[in-house]
Amino acid sequence: MSIQTSDPNETSDLKSLSLIAAHSHITGLGLDENLQPRPTSEGMVGQLQARRAAGVILKMVQNGTIAGRAVLVAGPPSTGKTALAMGVSQSLGKDVPFTAIAGSEIFSLELSKTEALTQAFRKSIGIKIKEETELIEGEVVEIQIDRSITGGHKQGKLTIKTTDMETIYELGNKMIDGLTKEKVLAGDVISIDKASGKITKLGRSFARSRDYDAMGADTRFVQCPEGELQKRKTVVHTVSLHEIDVINSRTQGFLALFTGDTGEIRSEVRDQINTKVAEWKEEGKAEIVPGVLFIDEVHMLDIECFSFINRALEDEFAPIVMMATNRGVSKTRGTNYKSPHGLPLDLLDRSIIITTKSYNEQEIKTILSIRAQEEEVELSSDALDLLTKTGVETSLRYSSNLISVAQQIAMKRKNNTVEVEDVKRAYLLFLDSARSVKYVQENESQYIDDQGNVQISIAKSADPDAMDTTE
């Protein structure tokens, strides 16, 4: 057996792995300040009416006054329903919680359906908790650290000043280690949290800007603080209700947030937390931020889940629930009757419905051009036209998937630009759904049917030299 070894002198270019998702090109809804959609903006193309409706929902969420509303995004496949939800997510920012789940995610052996839905609802409610902390903020004048010969207890003094006053603080082991870790020197402007002992380096004083010293490119010069050394500052922490539930429900506390092993959380714990949060809200210590829960493929939920959502929407702590489905009149899971979009009529009655329409040829061309730019693929104009034609005749998803495949074929030809022949070869190598269905119908007898039957036919050879197997 031969073992291939690489030449040590040979250099290989290591490219960084950049994962590009289906909706990574979307950065917002593409609306102006009057909620009017631009034809192409922030990765969104077309669907003007649906985007404007989503913009109204976005304003409702940002105002934070209205919660417990259900929004259904309904439309044919490949019309941008998930993209619309991703646009809402990007526009909300990091302070407003956005939770995205698929309808099939809640069916788990570890959690009941109602528990999984409850956790998703609680993840979508944010709590802004205001906390007053005492800080020591000033410019370091001098640091004196006395270390014993035996390497035991360390002592030190920190001289710190503002423009109005100067003070000397005694340092213990923990503070000395913190200052050493942050590499604090004389002339640095620092902030010390009195409660936790956390040291934050704010920058270097302007008074030391002319000192002859080696400084990095990221060195920041700041003014020496004014007034008192000790200041009170209000800090705002944003957490979700689910995170508070987890911390208060298990023995390991916040460690369960990292392991993900939250398990079932008792309703008594949640009731106590709801009561405490309501108290904080009345006292002005906390502010409730209703977020968005997005349930994709909502028709996969069953009748018990829909009944739970009906009740949860009326709760005091309820987010805005966005749902997406591509079903028409279909059977509701867990029942024998059909209903529009596969949802019960009572939930449909509570929902406001946004419809998406199929993209036209020009919109498909624009979307494919954006996707190619996102995937860093250079397409020739003829190749883009052929991909657009393929997208119109088959589907947008199939045409979008051909971009990266055609790039690999072009790279094999040592060409950086994807040409028409690369797209044609990719089209012949990979079938779309319509051609796949046609192939299955033509060769149906060779496939195993739903009864487990398959027809295996062996054609007899007409070769005169073939071995005679007859007796």
Swiss-Prot record:
It is found in: Nucleus, Nucleoplasm. Its EC number is 3.6.4.12. InterPro entries: AAA+_ATPase, P-loop_NTPase, RuvB-like, RuvB-like_C, RuvBL1/2_DNA/RNA_bd_dom, TIP49_P-loop. SUPFAM superfamilies: P-loop containing nucleoside triphosphate hydrolases. Gene3D superfamilies: 1.10.8.60, P-loop containing nucleotide triphosphate hydrolases, RuvB-like helicase, domain II. GO terms for molecular function: 3'-5' DNA helicase activity; 5'-3' DNA helicase activity; ATP binding; ATP hydrolysis activity; DNA helicase activity. ATP binds at residues 75-82. It catalyses: ATP + H2O = ADP + phosphate + H(+). One of its GO terms (cellular component) is R2TP complex. Changing residue 81 to A: Defect in snoRNA accumulation. Growth defect at 37 degrees Celsius. GO terms for biological process: box C/D snoRNP assembly; chromatin remodeling; DNA repair; protein stabilization; regulation of DNA-templated transcription; regulation of transcription by RNA polymerase II; rRNA processing. It is an enzyme of class 3 (hydrolase). Keywords: Activator, ATP-binding, Chromatin regulator, DNA damage, DNA repair, Helicase, Hydrolase, Nucleotide-binding, Nucleus, rRNA processing, Transcription, Transcription regulation. Probably forms a homohexamer. Interacts with RVB1 and may form heterododecamers with RVB1. Component of the SWR1 chromatin remodeling complex composed of at least ACT1, ARP4, RVB1, RVB2, ARP6, YAF9, VPS71, VPS72, SWC3, SWC4, SWC5, SWC7 and SWR1, and perhaps BDF1. Component of the chromatin-remodeling INO80 complex, at least composed of ARP4, ARP5, ARP8, RVB1, RVB2, TAF14, NHP10, IES1, IES3, IES4, IES6, ACT1, IES2, IES5 and INO80. Also belongs to the R2TP complex composed of at least RVB1, RVB2, TAH1 and PIH1. Interacts with SPT15/TBP. Belongs to the RuvB family. DNA helicase which participates in several chromatin remodeling complexes, including the SWR1 and the INO80 complexes. The SWR1 complex mediates the ATP-dependent exchange of histone H2A for the H2A variant HZT1 leading to transcriptional regulation of selected genes by chromatin remodeling. The INO80 complex remodels chromatin by shifting nucleosomes. Its ability to induce transcription of some phosphate-responsive genes is modulated by inositol polyphosphates. The INO80 complex is involved in DNA repair by associating to 'Ser-129' phosphorylated H2A histones as a response to DNA damage. Present with 3030 molecules/cell in log phase SD medium. PANTHER family: RUVB-RELATED REPTIN AND PONTIN (PTHR11093). This is RuvB-like protein 2. The gene is RVB2.
